[in-house]
Amino acid sequence: MRLLCGLWLWLSLLKVLQAQTPTPLPLPPPMQSFQGNQFQGEWFVLGLAGNSFRPEHRALLNAFTATFELSDDGRFEVWNAMTRGQHCDTWSYVLIPAAQPGQFTVDHGVEPGADREETRVVDSDYTQFALMLSRRHTSRLAVLRISLLGRSWLLPPGTLDQFICLGRAQGLSDDNIVFPDVTGWSPQASVC
């Protein structure tokens, strides 16, 4: 009898936990006319939105750049550089083309079995702005991140609204949006 009660309790808890795990919203499609050769180059990361960001993270985000280099096989090598005081933090990864143009899987260069991440370019005019959306699947949840990229710090009218609306369509609130602190920041090749 105890075994039966224990099994019933375990199954009940499993149902409760499954009900509390939100189903991720469907991702918007990647940009249909994506052109990798026009997308490559240096971008400033002007804003980030994600379900793991909180208001207290705003002070931690400094301005940074992302450089996309297109290889012959359609992969992008991506290098990021963020200044923190007098030193530079850098990290890199590879975007591997998926079935649709503008859609990629992310290779962080870690061991097999690491969390799976997919990313896509949702919109871009290639010369001024780009919106990218990434979703990383962990064993417990899906981590969503939306990046607002600009070739300069000046965005076309409506781009910021488009970024915020994309976040809201993915169930994010204004508290999930962070912008880098650019106080006193200027790109210096000697630092990074």
UniProtKB/Swiss-Prot annotation:
InterPro entries membership: Calycin, Lipocalin, Lipocln_cytosolic_FA-bd_dom
Pfam families: Lipocalin
Matching CDD domains: lipocalin_12 (cd19458)
Protein's name in the database: Epididymal-specific lipocalin-12
Secretion signal span: 1-19
Disulfide partners: 88-192
Keywords: Disulfide bond, Secreted, Signal, Transport
Similarity section: Belongs to the calycin superfamily. Lipocalin family.
Principal place of residence: secreted
Single GO MF annotation: retinoic acid binding
Function: Binds all-trans retinoic acid and may act as a retinoid carrier protein within the epididymis. May play a role in male fertility.
Protein localization: Secreted
Subunit relationships: Monomer.
GO cellular component entries: extracellular region; extracellular space
